[in-house]
């Protein structure tokens, strides 16, 4: 394996986990640049600050669609500043990279010609499922939240059908988002706001496997 001792490390002199060096090697192999490894200040988790090839970076497959209006406004600001000042959050997945927080910035910078995107690369891929907690770039409306949740739900169902639904309460945030997501997905003109107040009081996470819970909710 390549020696990454030249990469800046914080705390200084700390021994990086093998998984972080492996991630740095993967980033370099993918044509990116691993610039620094550090422990973030809250949980002391190891992360990498890197430049990721824009061609290998995309939003997670289950998050909301890009907003044309937000892209336009963001593009105007970026054109004026000619700077990319906020790194996106990234996990390595499916032979590329997903950003659960920063997809509008990624898309805008790429459209403006950026070949690499500054990123905080997180070693734990499950962080990609914590979109609703992480994503402060653009406020979610009810439909956005519900559709993202049902996409995450179905992804988790495919990966781990025997996992228990209530164990994903943090990721899904509110149980009624699952139910509303099913309805929004089926009926494009569905008005979830009418039912959300009541549904939020009666819907809860189930102590059943995702397969069983999905069948019940469907």
Each language-model region and where it sits:
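Solvent-exposed functional surfaces
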Residues: 4-14, 124, 128-218
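Short, charged/polar connector segments at secondary-structure boundaries
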Residues: 1-120, 163-174, 184-185, 189-192, ...
């Amino acid at each position: 394996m390549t020696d990454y001792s030249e990469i800046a490390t914080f705390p200084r002199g700390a021994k990086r986990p093998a998984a972080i060096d492996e991630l740095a090697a993967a980033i370099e192999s993918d044509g990116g640049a691993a610039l620094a490894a550090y422990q973030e200040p809250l949980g002391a988790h190891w992360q990498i600050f890197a430049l990721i090839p824009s061609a290998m970076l995309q939003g997670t497959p289950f998050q909301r669609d890009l907003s044309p209006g937000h892209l336009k406004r963001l593009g105007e600001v970026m054109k004026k500043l000619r700077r990319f000042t906020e790194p996106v959050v990234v996990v390595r997945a499916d032979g590329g990279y997903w950003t659960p927080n920063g997809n509008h910035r990624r898309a805008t910078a790429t459209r403006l010609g950026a070949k690499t995107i500054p990123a905080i690369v997180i070693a734990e891929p499950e962080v990609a499922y914590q979109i609703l907690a992480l994503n402060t770039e653009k406020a979610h409306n009810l439909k956005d939240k519900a559709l993202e949740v049902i996409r995450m739900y179905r992804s988790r169902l495919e990966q781990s059908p025997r996992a228990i639904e209530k164990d994903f309460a943090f990721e899904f945030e509110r149980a009624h988002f699952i139910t509303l997501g099913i309805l929004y997905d089926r009926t494009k003109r569905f008005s979830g706001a009418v039912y959300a107040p009541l549904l939020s009081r009666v819907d809860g996470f189930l102590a059943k496997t995702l397969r069983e819970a999905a069948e019940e909710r469907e």
